Every structure is written in C-alpha cells, then in structure tokens.
Design a protein with these regions (language model features):
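PAPS-dependent sulfation machinery
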Residues: 1-23, 41-61, 65
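Short beta-strand segments
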Residues: 6-7, 26, 90-92
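Short, flexible loop/turn elements at secondary-structure junctions
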Residues: 9-10, 28-31, 95-97
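A short catalytic or substrate-binding loop motif that flags glycine-/basic-rich loops and adjacent residues
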Residues: 17-19, 27, 71
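Conserved phosphate-donor/acceptor-positioning beta-strand/loop module used by diverse small-molecule
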Residues: 21-40
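PAPS-dependent sulfotransferases, especially Golgi type II membrane carbohydrate sulfotransferases
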Residues: 42, 46, 62-65, 80-81, ...
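PAPS-dependent sulfotransferase catalytic domain
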Residues: 45-106, 110-111, 115-118
C-alpha cells in the first residue's frame, strides 16, 4: 500500500491529476473559503502578511470564483472516481473546526490507529497553534469580500458545494464506518 500525503491547491492541471495512491484522506472545505485562503497564500510573498487590497476583490472576484468553483468540483469528482468507498475518508473542514476530536478520531480510525481519547485530546490541546499559522483576516473581512460576489455566483457555489460534499460523504468510508 502506498502511504503518501499530499496537499493540493486545485488548478486546471489538478482536475486531471492521476492519483497513484491506494487510499485517501480528503479534507473538504467550502470552495469560497478555500479559494480565499488559496489567494491569500499565493499572494502573501512568503507569509509577510500582506493581503490583496479590497479593490482587487471588487473588480475580479466574480469571474475568478466562477472559474475556480467549477475546477473545485471537477477535482473532487476526480477523487471520487479514483477511490472506492472503503479507501477514502472524507472530513469536512468546517466540521473539523467545530468538532476537532470527533473528526480526528474518524481519521485515525480510517488509518487503523488505536489511539485513546485522552492521548489524542492532549496532543490536540497542546498543538493547536504554532508559527506556521497565518494570521486571520480582521473580523468581518471575509464576509465583506464574499459580499462582492453576485447572488448568482454565491448560489452556484453553494449548490456545487452542498451537492459535491454530499456525494463525497455518501461514497466514502466516512459515511459507512465513522458516523456512529
């Protein structure tokens, strides 16, 4: 069994990426938030905490998101085509943020680890932050940026996200073994 971990920022090439792994642990994030995080990461010049001006988002956000939300969907569909349900564990990023222990237990169960709750909990509590963590946007800025999107783009993105996430959850180890 090939045991590799990779982090993929999606683009046109990754939608047709050939997966060469036996199993996958897939962290799924709302595409609107993922695209914003990716844009921040890509434009921050080695994590110097400079951000794109809000004017950039006002002028370019809608066409940029329309293109990338579709790529996000294609990439995730490609993942589903590449792995059988028992060989993919789907973790929703938003759920992970709210229920860290529960979601990480799903990961460890999928990977075959026998970790007791108190050991996992201590590890998580001691390592939640670090020098690698980028600073968060100022309060309310994400919602302001997302408000620049047209209603049509927002609805399209929400629909793609919900549909794709449900499809992933219904066709993965997550839904079969980890729900109860």
């Amino acid at each position: 069994m090939k045991n590799h971990i990779f982090k993929a920022y999606f683009n046109a090439k990754s939608a047709s990426f050939n997966f060469r792994y036996d199993r996958a642990l897939l962290l799924v994030r709302n595409p609107l938030h993922q695209i914003l995080a990716f844009t921040d990461w890509k434009t921050r010049n080695l994590h110097n905490n400079t951000r794109l001006p809000l004017k950039f988002y006002q002028d370019f956000l809608d066409p940029f998101f329309n293109k990338h939300v579709e790529l996000w969907q294609k990439w995730h569909e490609r993942v589903l085509e590449s792995f059988s349900a028992e060989n993919i564990c789907v973790i929703n990023y938003e759920d992970l943020r709210e229920n860290v222990l529960e979601e990480l237990q799903k990961c460890t169960q999928f990977l075959g680890f026998d970790i007791q709750n108190h050991i996992l909990q201590n590890c998580i509590l001691q390592n939640q932050t670090g020098h690698h963590k980028r600073t968060a946007r100022p309060f309310g800025e994400t919602q302001l940026i997302l408000s620049f999107l047209s209603k049509k783009t927002r609805l399209k993105s929400d629909e793609i996200y919900e549909k794709t996430l449900q499809k992933l959850l219904n066709n993965s180890y997550h839904s079969d073994k980890c729900m109860g």
